[in-house]
Amino acid sequence: MNIAANIADDLETGEADTSGHALFADAPRSVSFNKLRKRLLRQVRQAFDDFDMLKGQKRWLVGLSGGKDSYGLLALLLDLKWRGLLPVELIACNLDQGQPNFPKHVLPDYLTKIGVRHRIEYRDTYSIVKEKVPEGATYCSLCSRLRRGNLYRVAREEGCDALVLGHHREDILETFFMNFFHGGRLASMPAKLLNDEGDLMVLRPLAYAAEDDLAKFAAAMQFPIIPCDLCGSQDGLQRNAMKDMLADIERRMPGRKDTMLRALSHVNPSHLLDPKLFDFSTLGVTDPS
């Protein structure tokens, strides 16, 4: 089913939209907000189509950190579900990692208010990260692994087919350049991935969405944002350097982020240097199997 191309809905009129899930009850009624909302919905639907995200899917665990991106992801999925465009059960999950002064009431209160099934899981990964990571080193890698492992466990316990995450265009580009500059390889975040155990999909429906758009969407929707003190307390992260580099390129050459993202879906193995992808003796693409 080509959701992005074949489904017409009232957002296509470009007029202020007053319909949608209950969480949109207090959303702006302006045409500009409607255009933003329409653009994000279209990009999510395009990701569904391009990466066949809905195939065999019945229940998703949606990771909710309390940041703008995961709030936006949940809102857009609920919007599509309300419109009958997402035949998948959604469960929102926040992993309370034991950070000091974490406002424990914010997410359950918000999710209860908008009527979303949810699970708040407590695991003190904060203390583990602080203990294991040497002074001056970055927390991101270990923190991410611990968080992902717990989310996989919850997804299995809830009978979910996939873990759905809020990574966006900039996350994908930053990861590509981190691997390029620091890992010596061409790789990024896949929009759809089977986990190592082979029992869960990892999906990123915001792969085409711009971070600026998600920030505007979050501000307009007045999501109760929770800052990450663990990561936010660190300076000089490699990812921040990549973010600054991409922002500088975009300032000097507008539209380059979209061009770079398109490049990730137009790979020519014969014009690279990897004999595992291209057989230079027969001049044919190598069978990955």
Curated annotation (Swiss-Prot):
Q: Which GO terms describe its molecular function?
A: 4 iron, 4 sulfur cluster binding; ATP binding; magnesium ion binding; sulfurtransferase activity; tRNA binding
- Supply the SUPFAM superfamilies for this chain: Adenine nucleotide alpha hydrolases-like
Cite the Pfam families for this sequence: ATP_bind_3
**Reaction equation(s) it catalyzes:** cytidine(32) in tRNA + S-sulfanyl-L-cysteinyl-[cysteine desulfurase] + AH2 + ATP = 2-thiocytidine(32) in tRNA + L-cysteinyl-[cysteine desulfurase] + A + AMP + diphosphate + H(+)
User: Where mainly located?
Assistant: cytoplasm
Kindly give the CDD domains that the UniProt entry links to this protein: TtcA-like
Entry function? Catalyzes the ATP-dependent 2-thiolation of cytidine in position 32 of tRNA, to form 2-thiocytidine (s(2)C32). The sulfur atoms are provided by the cysteine/cysteine desulfurase (IscS) system.
Its protein name is tRNA-cytidine(32) 2-sulfurtransferase
Native source organism of the sequence: Rhizobium johnstonii (strain DSM 114642 / LMG 32736 / 3841) (Rhizobium leguminosarum bv. viciae)
Per the record, the gene is ttcA
